[in-house]
Amino acid sequence: MDNSDAILAMMDAFDNGGQGLAVWDPKDNLTSFNINYKKIFSSNMHFSPEVGLNFGKAYADAAKNPKFTLDPENTKQRIAQREQARLDKRPIESEYEVEPGKWLHVKETASNDGHMITVLTDVTARKTREIMQSKLADAIDAIPSHVMFWDEKEKLIKANKLAVKENLEYEVELREGMSYAEFLSSQF
């Protein structure tokens, strides 16, 4: 397998994994990308990427389009982080809500020669779950009586703030993962 076959295999593997993959040269010009990257980029930037496209210019051009929804401050920060990542040779990771209800995880890693590898992963399902779990936790905490949830193995999953606070008054510390037997024995 020669080098170009290896690159194609890598691009295909990332496509099969549902991730976008792009390679940028040391001057931040796009050298290669997979199909998923093209789809994600086109959806967010409102134009298709092409080999030779400059990263900063792409954002400047996209910002002129009224459909472009990414925050200009986030864009400046991302460009600065990419430059710092090139200097530090450390990956940077961020999550962005690219449109209402759609989230991307972006990981960018610099090579030793200054190239930047960008991996885009759609994390909308996970972010939606996290948001719903947070709302549920807030709702449970708002209930004006003790609420404790136990799993099938009688381990504490969640206790609302009132239950935690009032049990502490009796020196009973509620901890996620504690058994129901521990809870009962700590009361007496």
Annotate each language-model stretch with its function:
Residues 19-87, 145-188:
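PAS-family sensory domains
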Residues 1, 13, 18, 101, ...:
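Short coil/turn motifs at helix boundaries and re-entrant loops, enriched in small/polar
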Residues 16, 111-112, 142, 175:
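A generic fold-level signal
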Residues 3-30, 132-152:
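Sensory modules in modular signal-transduction proteins
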Residues 6-8, 15, 79-83, 88-91, ...:
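Sparse, context-dependent recognition of short Cys/His-centered cofactor- or disulfide-binding micro-motifs
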